[in-house]
Curated annotation (Swiss-Prot):
Source organism: Mus musculus (Mouse)
This protein's name: DNA-directed RNA polymerase III subunit RPC7
Modified residues (Phosphothreonine): T134
Phosphoserine: modified positions: S158
Predominant subcellular localization, coarse grouping: nucleus
Region (Disordered): 111-223
InterPro entries for the chain: RNA_pol_III_Rpc31
Keywords, sorted A to Z: Antiviral defense, Cytoplasm, Immunity, Innate immunity, Nucleus, Phosphoprotein, Transcription
Family: Belongs to the eukaryotic RPC7 RNA polymerase subunit family.
Annotated localization: Nucleus; Cytoplasm
Expression sites by tissue: Expressed at low levels in the liver.
Protein role: DNA-dependent RNA polymerase catalyzes the transcription of DNA into RNA using the four ribonucleoside triphosphates as substrates. Specific peripheric component of RNA polymerase III (Pol III) which synthesizes small non-coding RNAs including 5S rRNA, snRNAs, tRNAs and miRNAs from at least 500 distinct genomic loci. Acts as a long tether that bridges POLR3C/RPC3-POLR3F/RPC6-POLR3G/RPC7 heterotrimer and the mobile stalk of Pol III, coordinating the dynamics of Pol III stalk and clamp modules during the transition from apo to elongation state.
A Pfam family of this chain: RNA_pol_3_Rpc31
Amino acid sequence: MAGNKGRGRAAYTFNIEAVGFSRGEKLPDVVLKPPPLFPDTDYKPVPLKTGEDEDYMLALKQELRETVKRLPYFIEPPEEKQDDIERYSKRYMKVYKEEWVPDWRRLPREMMPRKKCKKGDPKSKPSKAAAKATSLINSADVLKTIEELEKRGEGERSDEENEEKEGSKEKDKDDEEDGEEDAEQEDYDEEEQEEENDYINSYFDNGDDFGVDSDDNMDEATY
């Protein structure tokens, strides 16, 4: 029951005895020492020769190596100077590169670089007559386009003038209507002012004149 349902210890999937250990045996101790640097050689190197000749050859070899490093044997492409951006660090930089100009008299002609000229195909070159015809066609097209543009400009100008005339007429009509409305408003305002100013006239009546005409026909009292 313990092996199939996930309980108990897991069983080993490989044979330990095949590795060289038996069950219950201790593993060997871990070695913490570094390995030897170089294995023992059967043939030992010959000791270097010392003396004035060897020292002279060594100094000569070193001097030759340094001179070869300084010579411009490696031709580099010229750097393009960018004058747009001036950097502060470039002001004090010293250029140690030397321009190498070889003496071509001592070198073969095959080593001399040559500029390659691009040769065009004869088929691709147009003839003079075809070039003239294309130039005439282009000039005629240019004249046509200029005439069309002039016509368009004249049409636009006439349209603008008509629009300006119509706009001026509409403005005149609006001004006349505004003048009539202003006149009507002034008349109306005058009538209102007259009605409002009626209180200036005196309408007071004390009643003395009441019945003056009727006294002539009335009979006086007799005593």
